[in-house]
Amino acid sequence: KGPLGHIEYTGKGNFIAHGEPKFARRLAMLAGGTGITPIYQVIQAVLKDPDDRTEMFFAVYSNKTESDILLREELDAWAKKHSDRFKVWYVVDKAGNDWAFSTGRVNESIMRVHLPGPSDALALACGPPPINSAYGWQPSLENIGYKKDDVPVFMATTQS
């Protein structure tokens, strides 16, 4: 099944997250594997509106290997074209010698370097349940200053 949780981007930094209005000038976006899908839709919505100046720091996109990265060409093209407000950082479990990004697991130090600080920011996360859990990304985001209410989560699930 696809992601659970209702998060709607209404434009120019405005969201409805689980029924509550939210606003952010900057977005910290985290995705694991196919969790890129709803995050990609938000990026696409922001970039198609020339008046939307929301900054997106899609700092962490985690996969097992480089070949598992979905939509990489599109993400890299957007990062190049919109370098003033869209950044992407990849993390893979295993990489070749020429890999220019991070290897291993997404952790607090990677988030501190590649995500915006929590002031005027909202973090969007989507990935398998273990990385969205209390043992995954949430504690690291809280440690760098994000409040739990500022981290709407699209929860990917494999349940039928």
Swiss-Prot record:
FAD binds at residue 37. It comes from the Eukaryota. GO terms for biological process: nitrate assimilation; nitric oxide biosynthetic process. Keywords: FAD, Flavoprotein, Heme, Iron, Metal-binding, Molybdenum, NAD, Nitrate assimilation, Oxidoreductase. Its cofactor is FAD; heme; Mo-molybdopterin. The keyword Iron applies. Its EC number is 1.7.1.1. SUPFAM superfamilies: Ferredoxin reductase-like, C-terminal NADP-linked domain. Coiled coil: none annotated. Gene3D superfamilies: Nucleotide-binding domain of ferredoxin-NADP reductase (FNR) module. It catalyses: nitrite + NAD(+) + H2O = nitrate + NADH + H(+). Binds 1 FAD. GO terms for molecular function: FAD binding; metal ion binding; nitrate reductase (NADH) activity. CDD domains: cyt_b5_reduct_like. Homodimer. Nitrate reductase is a key enzyme involved in the first step of nitrate assimilation in plants, fungi and bacteria. Belongs to the nitrate reductase family. This is Nitrate reductase [NADH]. The lineage of its organism: Eukaryota, Viridiplantae, Streptophyta, Embryophyta, Tracheophyta.
